[in-house]
Regions:
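Transmembrane alpha-helix signature in integral membrane proteins
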Residues: 7-38
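Loop-to-helix entry region at the N-terminal start of transmembrane alpha-helices
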Residues: 8, 12-16, 59-62, 66-99, ...
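Non-cytoplasmic
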Residues: 76, 147-196, 207
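C-terminal transmembrane helix and the adjacent membrane-cytosol boundary/short C-terminal tail
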Residues: 34-41, 187-218
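Cytoplasmic-entry segments and transmembrane alpha-helices of multi-pass inner-membrane transporters
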Residues: 34-72, 94, 99, 104-108
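Transmembrane alpha-helices
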Residues: 18, 128-161
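Short cytoplasmic-facing helical segments at TM-TM junctions of multi-pass membrane proteins
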Residues: 105-144, 174, 214, 218
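Membrane-embedded alpha-helices of multi-pass transport/permease systems
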Residues: 26-31, 88-92, 96-118, 148-149, ...
């Protein structure tokens, strides 16, 4: 192993983590909004059975261990990317595992919004879509950014486990060399690099959340 190998592994880990987080956000953000807006006391109430079904599906997906989930979604992975091994193949199970988690994080952030703010927007004749895009999301933006940072670091941890299916990145190196070949020094280097990546993501996310908090600019 040389510096170039580690550099490429870091890039693969970064690529898979960011891409998976982006797709998880695309699916999880609307779902999280739906969980709040579609509630019986929400701005766009949906049938109780439908909300109950959505919650059950989210809870089931969140409860399945990631390694088992990777195997379960092999058919879906093969249908989308044409293979079940490699860097691209790890994105599919990562997204499936992450988007329910993102939805719950979004739901938690939006539920922290003062109901009076939403009621004020409704009294001024704002539509549900306007309330979501102009009131709920902007007001909860710092919390949402913090939640996405949490999701990003969690997905980073999941991506390391994807080395089991030859997913590439630091996880593959740690498994192939550190575990199977008993090269503890390589395992330690991979762990340190993953910790540094988590710290970097967390620092950037915290700074962004602070900058977006309008209360701190008043």
């Amino acid at each position: 192993m040389n510096i170039a190998d580690y550099g490429f592994a870091i890039w693969e880990t970064f690529y898979v983590t960011v891409l998976s987080t982006a797709f998880a956000l695309v699916l999880g953000l609307p779902l999280g909004v739906l969980l709040v807006a579609g509630d019986k006391d929400g701005i766009l109430p949906l049938p109780g059975w439908l909300m109950h079904l959505i919650n059950i599906v989210i809870n089931i997906l969140r409860s399945v261990p990631f390694l088992i989930l990777m195997i379960c979604v092999f058919p879906l992975t093969r249908a989308i990317v044409g293979t079940t091994v490699g860097t691209k193949a790890t994105v599919v199970p990562l997204v499936v595992a992450a988007f329910p988690f993102v939805a719950r994080l979004v739901e938690t952030s939006l539920r922290e919004l003062d109901e009076g703010v939403v009621e004020a927007a409704q009294s001024m004749g704002a539509t549900p879509f306007q309330i979501i895009t102009k009131v709920m999301i902007p007001e909860c933006l710092p919390g949402l950014i913090s939640s996405m940072t949490t999701a990003l670091t969690t997905i980073l941890g999941y991506s390391a486990m994807s080395g089991v299916i030859g997913g590439g990145g630091l996880g593959k190196i740690a498994l192939s060399y550190g575990y199977y070949r008993y090269q503890t020094n390589i395992m330690i280097v991979c762990v340190v690099l993953l910790v540094l990546m988590v710290q970097a993501f967390q620092s950037v996310g915290t700074l962004w959340a602070t900058k977006s908090d309008t209360r701190l600019r008043k």
